[in-house]
Amino acid sequence: MGEKQILDADDIRRAITRIAHEIAERNAGVRDVALVGIRRRGAPLAMRIAAALEEIERVRVPVGVLDITLYRDDLGIRGPAPVVHATDIPFDISGRTVVLVDDVLYTGRTIRAALDALTDFGRPARIQLAVLIDRGHRELPIRADFVGKNVPTSRDERIATRLHEVDGGVDGVFIVRTTATSG
């Protein structure tokens, strides 16, 4: 099982800055924009995007954290006792543009669960999606509005995102081969 680094800390910083510029441009500013990071690695990415938006627009954008554990369609498959974490959305999402943030977009099932969970908290005017990595292989008709990097992968590869807020150490994104190849 090998891994290959595809983004380092500087690449991630540049991607976040670009995503922040795109969010501000697409929404003609950030007056009614809020960010909601999907728990685990989407949450620190949302905080970083918010910091970049504040630097660009001189406006503090509200940030929340969404736990989707009980909304997943693979709940029974993943194990007997899922660990549920707190959702923290300390603002009203109704009438706002909410940008959902996650680290990797793959099948679309995590985002479907996040949409279900998010709408339990109100009725946003619109929901947009920002991801650091889009790796393809969609199973649902979901696409990201803002993408740090498109990384085509095979089904026997996965993307490992490491963020210092969650994992310690240095930021990076890696392609990890999950099965041995015959050769």
Curated annotation (Swiss-Prot):
<dbReference type="Pfam" id="PF00156">
    <property type="entry name" value="Pribosyltran"/>
</dbReference>
<comment type="function">
    <text>Regulates the transcription of the pyrimidine nucleotide (pyr) operon in response to exogenous pyrimidines.</text>
</comment>
<dbReference type="GO" id="GO:0004845">
    <property type="term" value="F:uracil phosphoribosyltransferase activity"/>
</dbReference>
<dbReference type="GO" id="GO:0006355">
    <property type="term" value="P:regulation of DNA-templated transcription"/>
</dbReference>
<dbReference type="InterPro" id="IPR050137">
    <property type="entry name" value="PyrR_bifunctional"/>
</dbReference>
<dbReference type="InterPro" id="IPR000836">
    <property type="entry name" value="PRibTrfase_dom"/>
</dbReference>
<dbReference type="InterPro" id="IPR023050">
    <property type="entry name" value="PyrR"/>
</dbReference>
<keyword id="KW-0808">Transferase</keyword>
<feature type="short sequence motif" description="PRPP-binding">
    <location>
        <begin position="98"/>
        <end position="110"/>
    </location>
</feature>
<protein>
    <recommendedName>
        <fullName>Bifunctional protein PyrR</fullName>
        <ecNumber>2.4.2.9</ecNumber>
    </recommendedName>
</protein>
<comment type="similarity">
    <text>Belongs to the purine/pyrimidine phosphoribosyltransferase family. PyrR subfamily.</text>
</comment>
<comment type="function">
    <text>Also displays a weak uracil phosphoribosyltransferase activity which is not physiologically significant.</text>
</comment>
<keyword id="KW-0804">Transcription</keyword>
<dbReference type="InterPro" id="IPR029057">
    <property type="entry name" value="PRTase-like"/>
</dbReference>
<keyword id="KW-0328">Glycosyltransferase</keyword>
<keyword id="KW-0805">Transcription regulation</keyword>
